[in-house]
Amino acid sequence: MTNDVLTSLEILLAYKHARHCSRIKARMELPAVRGLSLLESASGKDTRVPVDPMTSPPYKWICSLLIESARGERFIGSGFKIHLPDVDRTAVVTSGHCTYMYEERTYATKITVTFPGRRAVTVGPNDIYASPEYINTGDKDHDYGLILLPGTSDDGFGWSAIIPDEELNNRTVINCGYPADRPIGTMWITDGVITSHTANRIYYKNVTVGGQSGSPFYTWYGGYWTVLAVHSYGRCPNFAPRFTREMISRFLERMNGLKKKSLRSVAFPHVYLRCDGTGVTRWERPGGGTVNCQYKPPSLWESFYIYPVEMAPSLASQTTYKVVIESAQFRHVFIRMDSQGMNHSMGPGGGEVNCQFTVSPWEFFYLRRETNGSYSFRNVQFPHCYIRLDGRGVDSCLEPGGGIVNCQYYDDPSIPASTWESFHLEVH
């Protein structure tokens, strides 16, 4: 990687080339690559306004991209930082077509990233990523990419991969980026409403043009600006690939941030949470498999990928975030909680903790750090209930495991969890 100060001449040439491409070959995409289109993508009046100053949140998290292909052509795009915990690189999200030249079947040779008021940074193919679906088939549902910048950063947008569909209907949304039809290096913002959505796309009628591919598509949700999707395509309406659990998992894996972890009970310090997902190969309403306990040392059956599916921005004061617990032995199998009917604390616990294929709110948990340094897992669907482990009698390693893992109800879920509902996270 090298640090370069981007010259105005370089950017000007890229903008002129982008505008020329749009005149000779307009497409429905708004790519920063060959065939870039400046076709306005919403009907009616252009409501875009310039952002000034650009150095306060969330605007300081939005960057311009100068992209160079293997053919030596230069194009423009946008990107944005997201808040990811416990990673050793800075994550910049953009469109897959900003990092991978699908028609050339190769990654960009270099991308220069410039944030407002900051020195430009140039990275090469080893530090950029596009989804395998986009690389293999140009799949628009998976047209997302990642740029890895040097150094750690706790700065960035909040985001959600699990916002309920009912929250999207007619929701006001914002797009902000660096359009090619405006002065060099200027950021423009516009709002609109969501017109429809699918599991992988959000459609909307914001005015956008070429150069804005890879810019954040965000809304006010949960008390902060939250990115929901990556703006990538323009027509009437536009659409953007949604943030998904799979996307975040892949980003973390690319950043070496998806690490196996074991959950060791605080109350039973030699006992670990165990998951047997045998036969759990499709979604079924009651879930399946077995979640129980195992004596040390932990194996893959006691190992998990625990990663966020919704995060507050770096400036938020929240101490919890939503995660999934995916089995390392049985990929795509997640810890599930069903505490229907529980409305008070029960000595032996209650409800059921088992497995599910893929995820829903029953598989989402609030991860909270407890005062003793351990962690607790409170369910999103049942927000008064925590995962509980009873390891009595588990004093040797048995093949089917033993003990009980179930639920515990808290009248006030803000109070510290007991040691039976607390776990030490051990990274493998």
At which residue positions do the language-model features occur?
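Short beta->alpha transition motifs characteristic of CBS
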Residues: S95-Y100, G210, L228-P237
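C-terminal cap/linker of serine protease catalytic domains
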Residues: M1, L228-K259
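A structural micro-motif recognizing beta-strand termini
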Residues: L66-A70, L148-D154, K205-G210, A267, ...
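Serine endopeptidase catalytic core focused on the charge-relay Asp
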Residues: P57-K60, I67, F75-I76, D88, ...
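Extracellular glycan-recognition/adhesion modules and their associated mucin-like linkers
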Residues: G257-R285, L300-S345, P361-C397, I415-H428
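Acidic glycine-/aspartate-rich tracts in secreted/extracellular proteins
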Residues: C98-Y100, G117-A120, G151-D154, P179-D181, ...
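Protease-domain processing segments flanking chymotrypsin-fold serine proteases, especially trypsin-like
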Residues: M1-D86, R250-K259
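Catalytic nucleophile loop of clan PA
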Residues: F80, D86, V207-S232
